[in-house]
Amino acid sequence: MKLTNYDIIRRPLITEKTMASMADKKYTFVVDIHANKSQIKNAIETIFDVKVEDVKTARIMGKTKRVGVHIGKRPDYKKAIVKLTEDSKTIEFFEGL
């Protein structure tokens, strides 16, 4: 199954730590678990019309949760930290947060 650019980028990851890193033009996204760095770079450049300098990825394992005697697990996900070039514009989606 071929992933489109909009299938690769799931959602932005907004935390205090990621908001602080936006000053250095580093943006964090939850991405498809099967996407590689070159696909993520291409998707970000196409969707947001920016230039990407570096992509770092991490696979996060879901936590085990329990409700009474029932045990479940949150899904695993992959996050990508995307650094933009110095002459690139900022991503407008994140402005005003």
Swiss-Prot record:
Pfam families: Ribosomal_L23 (PF00276). Keywords: Ribonucleoprotein, Ribosomal protein, RNA-binding, rRNA-binding. GO terms for biological process: translation. It comes from the Bacteria. The keyword Zinc does not apply. One of its GO terms (molecular function) is rRNA binding. GO terms for cellular component: ribonucleoprotein complex; ribosome. Belongs to the universal ribosomal protein uL23 family. HAMAP family: Ribosomal_uL23_B. Part of the 50S ribosomal subunit. Contacts protein L29, and trigger factor when it is bound to the ribosome. One of the early assembly proteins it binds 23S rRNA. One of the proteins that surrounds the polypeptide exit tunnel on the outside of the ribosome. Forms the main docking site for trigger factor binding to the ribosome. This is Large ribosomal subunit protein uL23. It comes from Clostridium botulinum (strain ATCC 19397 / Type A). The gene is rplW.
